[in-house]
């Protein structure tokens, strides 16, 4: 909005030229989202607490300490993140950029699926919400619509091609399979973040780290000069997604203020599915789907731990981990919750640095 209102006046008022800069608007979106989520946080949390009464149902088969320590904490805190994120993006982003609208569509669509899941859990006072197959169906519908839109706005030769890290010019043409591949990235990213969201502050910081990394990537791939210098594929228009990433970080920081141990509110599926879907959509738009697996490696580890645990138990009757997802395994080994959280944050930073290194190591 401000880009259109004030950027167009830059010819008459030189100072307004800053609204044309993606970096300035990214910073503005970050601060705006932080202030909104921070200031409205207490009211939203109080409302959630009043409506939910007993708070988020705690898994009886999970760590027993959670039943005692986390009982009564409200969920759906992702709504607080979205309240900070969406207005900030609309205020600071270029409304004519179609990538921004596509990622917003994915974010709100997955957020709606998560909200339905959280609502059923709270209303039924049960950890079981929307059936898994139903949830996946709607997630894939949203993701496939987004993929159709992303292919429409992309240009040849990148429309349905997969770029490979460490290789300058290598493109793997996927054709029609690219729609399914991209949808898998978006849905997989969404559910991987969802599985990671099991301890106070555990998911939101790695999400912000991934958003910061992707924000830098979209800024570089969306700039012809930087893309040519780094010898990465130039994707026109994706630079505007840096504003979205900035807003996500700001909203995440505001949420973390209330989600830090001991949490006053849980993110819930409303937040985890929305944020994970957003990260996946941004990676697909920037043609860095495989790099997302490195940057978001912590989410991959959490998801794989669940897959391995379930497969092993069904095939052999034995469990590989003491409990899945992975963070619960370390809790069962005797690690304190803050220890697990901070160490997983460190892993996220290291993996993000490794992912960003692929921009130069070619």
Curated annotation (Swiss-Prot):
InterPro entries: Glycosyl_transferase_4, PNAcMuramoyl-5peptid_Trfase, PNAcMuramoyl-5peptid_Trfase_CS. GO terms for cellular component: plasma membrane. It is found in: Cell inner membrane. Its EC number is 2.7.8.13. It catalyses: UDP-N-acetyl-alpha-D-muramoyl-L-alanyl-gamma-D-glutamyl-meso-2,6-diaminopimeloyl-D-alanyl-D-alanine + di-trans,octa-cis-undecaprenyl phosphate = di-trans,octa-cis-undecaprenyl diphospho-N-acetyl-alpha-D-muramoyl-L-alanyl-D-glutamyl-meso-2,6-diaminopimeloyl-D-alanyl-D-alanine + UMP. It is a multi-pass membrane protein. Its main location: membrane. It holds the Pfam family MraY_sig1. GO terms for molecular function: metal ion binding; phospho-N-acetylmuramoyl-pentapeptide-transferase activity; UDP-N-acetylmuramoyl-L-alanyl-D-glutamyl-meso-2,6-diaminopimelyl-D-alanyl-D-alanine:undecaprenyl-phosphate transferase activity. GO terms for biological process: cell division; cell wall organization; peptidoglycan biosynthetic process; regulation of cell shape. Pathway: Cell wall biogenesis; peptidoglycan biosynthesis. It is an enzyme of class 2 (transferase). Catalyzes the initial step of the lipid cycle reactions in the biosynthesis of the cell wall peptidoglycan: transfers peptidoglycan precursor phospho-MurNAc-pentapeptide from UDP-MurNAc-pentapeptide onto the lipid carrier undecaprenyl phosphate, yielding undecaprenyl-pyrophosphoryl-MurNAc-pentapeptide, known as lipid I. Belongs to the glycosyltransferase 4 family. MraY subfamily. This is Phospho-N-acetylmuramoyl-pentapeptide-transferase. It comes from Parvibaculum lavamentivorans (strain DS-1 / DSM 13023 / NCIMB 13966). The lineage of its organism: Bacteria, Pseudomonadati, Pseudomonadota, Alphaproteobacteria, Hyphomicrobiales.
């Amino acid at each position: 909005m401000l880009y259109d209102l004030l950027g167009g006046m830059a010819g008459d008022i030189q100072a307004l030229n800053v609204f044309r800069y993606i970096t300035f608007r990214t910073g503005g979106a970050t601060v705006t989202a932080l202030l909104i989520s921070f200031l409205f946080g207490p009211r939203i949390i109080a409302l959630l607490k009043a409506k939910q009464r007993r708070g988020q149902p705690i898994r009886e088969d999970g760590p027993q300490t959670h039943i005692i320590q986390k009982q009564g904490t409200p969920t759906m805190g992702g709504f607080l993140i979205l309240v900070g994120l969406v207005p900030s993006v609309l205020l600071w982003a270029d409304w004519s950029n179609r990538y921004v609208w596509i990622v917003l569509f994915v974010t709100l669509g997955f957020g709606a699926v998560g909200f339905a899941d959280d609502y059923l859990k709270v209303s039924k006072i049960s950890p079981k919400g929307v059936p898994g197959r139903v949830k996946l169906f709607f997630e894939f519908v949203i993701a496939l619509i987004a993929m159709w839109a992303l292919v429409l706005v992309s240009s040849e030769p990148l429309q349905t091609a997969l770029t490979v890290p460490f290789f300058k010019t290598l493109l793997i043409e996927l054709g029609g399979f690219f729609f399914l591949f991209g949808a898998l990235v978006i849905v997989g990213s969404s559910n991987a973040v969802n599985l990671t969201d099991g301890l106070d502050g555990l998911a939101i910081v790695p999400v912000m780290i991934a958003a910061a990394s992707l924000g830098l990537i979209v800024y570089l791939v969306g700039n012809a000069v930087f893309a040519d210098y780094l010898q990465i594929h130039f994707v026109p228009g994706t630079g505007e997604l840096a504003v979205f990433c900035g807003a996500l970080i700001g909203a995440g920081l505001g949420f973390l203020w209330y989600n830090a141990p001991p949490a006053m509110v849980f993110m819930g599926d409303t937040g985890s599915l929305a944020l994970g879907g957003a990260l996946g959509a941004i990676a697909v738009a920037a043609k860095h789907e495989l790099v997302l697996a490195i940057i978001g490696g912590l989410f991959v580890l959490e998801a794989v731990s669940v897959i391995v645990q379930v497969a092993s138990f069904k095939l052999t009757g034995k469990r590989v981990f003491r409990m899945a997802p992975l963070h619960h395994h370390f809790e069962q080994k005797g690690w304190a919750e803050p220890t697990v959280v901070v160490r997983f944050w460190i892993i996220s930073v290291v993996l993000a640095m490794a992912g960003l290194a692929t921009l130069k190591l070619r």
